Amino acid sequence: MKEIFFAKNDLSNLEYSLNREVLRANVSNAYSCTTLPFCNTRKYHGLLIVPQPKIDNQNHVLLSSLDETINQNNNSFHLALHRYQNGVYSPKGHKYLESYELGLLPTHTYRIGSIVLLKQMFFQEKQDRLLIKYTLKEA
């Protein structure tokens, strides 16, 4: 099976990457839907969306996004990307994205100076649970 791969040029180009959505789901109907750089641009975007039969039988966004920060030598590097009114984006974490590979375990690779960080997100098969794994590959 050929894996889908996006390089830094694709990910740092917001006109391109914000128009590419990633959808992952499991058998319990939980799902994650967002753009390549994790910037939610639509109402239905989120990292963990789960049907709530005890409330109203509708899907609810339980986890919208994460605002991860890497601290190195008294400097903070924010990995998130949010879109605000008038086309303002902040913080600009997409500039640290090195690659995205969609395989069995989707992997975002971030590079901040000499640090290389892998971020993998996957669902437990039959539970409404999203697992996020970070691996420090180089430092």
Where are these regions (language model features)?
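Terminal accessory carbohydrate-recognition/targeting modules of carbohydrate-active enzymes
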Residues: 1-139
